[in-house]
């Protein structure tokens, strides 16, 4: 018996859907703009070493990760014409290691720029790097004063090869937020100070703001993995994941009885409770207790009681007994149970749902509608 057979849950990842989402997002860009693939956090929890080849096959040649080790883990998958950007830049003391790789660090501060310039000078080569300017997020990036100082003294920039200038939108998922236009204007002014460099502003939601936000390179992340980039409207992206939990036990309730920790739900007489082998240790949000929904044999079934570490309980009273049985699979995410819907019920965001998908889930890569267990 293999891991998938022993496991109490199954996560199916549709690589074709990821590729289709990338193609759809690229198709929305202005002529001449390129589309990267953000594969940080192990491709949002879905497996970067599986996702990267799918994006390469679709035509993607620009990739983005957050940390050096994430980049080193997938570098061997990339052809010579691909580029891999590391958003956090080189940690202090790791500059030589990054130089020895083909990673392109994003330099976020005067200190990082100085350290990268000195490392390049020691190595005797002008290695590539990207520059991050802060236009309103207030996390990483050069402030306007730091940018002025950098351009006033060209010596550090002369020691390496800048290949990209970028910033990050703070409110792109709110199209009418005034900060969007403010950031675009600030970034356009900053990018104009680096003639000849590619410029990158838009994340997934930023792509939908319009061509003025596209510049030379867009950096979609959540949209690749099925998250809705257009809040309040129909999701234009294909769903990518299907998560199923196995029923471990079915209990018939003859008199009203409480269910789960804290006795937060009382099952009425005549109800049927199914316990599934998924919990918050697997990334299913604890806050979704008494709020989330599942699907069993095409019927909607509610989570009742609290989410515990390893278990969920569902009211399956409306499902025929021959279908609500130990070994049957309840869909927790899928084409009709989106990541965004679960995030809404758990008072969180789709990014968190995806990146917390647990290591205990065996991953099956293929079509979302394969292996339904029904």
Curated annotation (Swiss-Prot):
<dbReference type="Pfam" id="PF01168">
    <property type="entry name" value="Ala_racemase_N"/>
</dbReference>
<feature type="modified residue" description="N6-(pyridoxal phosphate)lysine">
    <location>
        <position position="40"/>
    </location>
</feature>
<dbReference type="Pfam" id="PF00842">
    <property type="entry name" value="Ala_racemase_C"/>
</dbReference>
<dbReference type="InterPro" id="IPR001608">
    <property type="entry name" value="Ala_racemase_N"/>
</dbReference>
<dbReference type="GO" id="GO:0008784">
    <property type="term" value="F:alanine racemase activity"/>
</dbReference>
<protein>
    <recommendedName>
        <fullName>Alanine racemase</fullName>
        <ecNumber>5.1.1.1</ecNumber>
    </recommendedName>
</protein>
<dbReference type="GO" id="GO:0005829">
    <property type="term" value="C:cytosol"/>
</dbReference>
<dbReference type="InterPro" id="IPR029066">
    <property type="entry name" value="PLP-binding_barrel"/>
</dbReference>
<keyword id="KW-0663">Pyridoxal phosphate</keyword>
<dbReference type="InterPro" id="IPR009006">
    <property type="entry name" value="Ala_racemase/Decarboxylase_C"/>
</dbReference>
<dbReference type="InterPro" id="IPR000821">
    <property type="entry name" value="Ala_racemase"/>
</dbReference>
<feature type="binding site">
    <location>
        <position position="309"/>
    </location>
    <ligand>
        <name>substrate</name>
    </ligand>
</feature>
<dbReference type="InterPro" id="IPR011079">
    <property type="entry name" value="Ala_racemase_C"/>
</dbReference>
<feature type="active site" description="Proton acceptor; specific for L-alanine">
    <location>
        <position position="261"/>
    </location>
</feature>
<comment type="similarity">
    <text>Belongs to the alanine racemase family.</text>
</comment>
<dbReference type="GO" id="GO:0030170">
    <property type="term" value="F:pyridoxal phosphate binding"/>
</dbReference>
<feature type="binding site">
    <location>
        <position position="139"/>
    </location>
    <ligand>
        <name>substrate</name>
    </ligand>
</feature>
<feature type="active site" description="Proton acceptor; specific for D-alanine">
    <location>
        <position position="40"/>
    </location>
</feature>
<keyword id="KW-0413">Isomerase</keyword>
<dbReference type="InterPro" id="IPR020622">
    <property type="entry name" value="Ala_racemase_pyridoxalP-BS"/>
</dbReference>
<comment type="function">
    <text>Catalyzes the interconversion of L-alanine and D-alanine. May also act on other amino acids.</text>
</comment>
<dbReference type="GO" id="GO:0030632">
    <property type="term" value="P:D-alanine biosynthetic process"/>
</dbReference>
<comment type="pathway">
    <text>Amino-acid biosynthesis; D-alanine biosynthesis; D-alanine from L-alanine: step 1/1.</text>
</comment>
